[in-house]
Amino acid sequence: MKPGFSAQDKVREGLTAALDRKASAVLVFNLTELTTMADYFVLSTASSERQARAIADAIAEKLGPALSVEGMTHAHWILLDYGDVVFHVFQEEARKFYALERLWGDAANETGIFSGMAPRETRRI
């Protein structure tokens, strides 16, 4: 992990990297009021294993090595844990199955704050 990055810096840089690799359905959830496990979850969707790995690699290239990485082998759901920020890169079927949007639905959606775009509606899965 690159030194001196705040949680917001990690979200911004990781989000930029994911979008540069054409990640879709990107959401940023602020979890600070709900849990101590992380301040932010960043969810994104890839259309293939190859794209999922490319997104995860781009995030790691921007932020440096994660504290923990899970799921690179099959790339259905790749998790990159940066302590206060956790990036989730899903293939579409895995995203539908695990439905983290529902699980963390009480969290503030801050996608627009970080991307400069209006928050995308969470698709009903």
How would you label these PLM feature ranges?
Residues 55-61:
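Short amphipathic alpha-helices in soluble, non-transmembrane regions
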Residues 1-33, 47-50, 54, 71-77, ...:
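Long, contiguous binding/interaction regions
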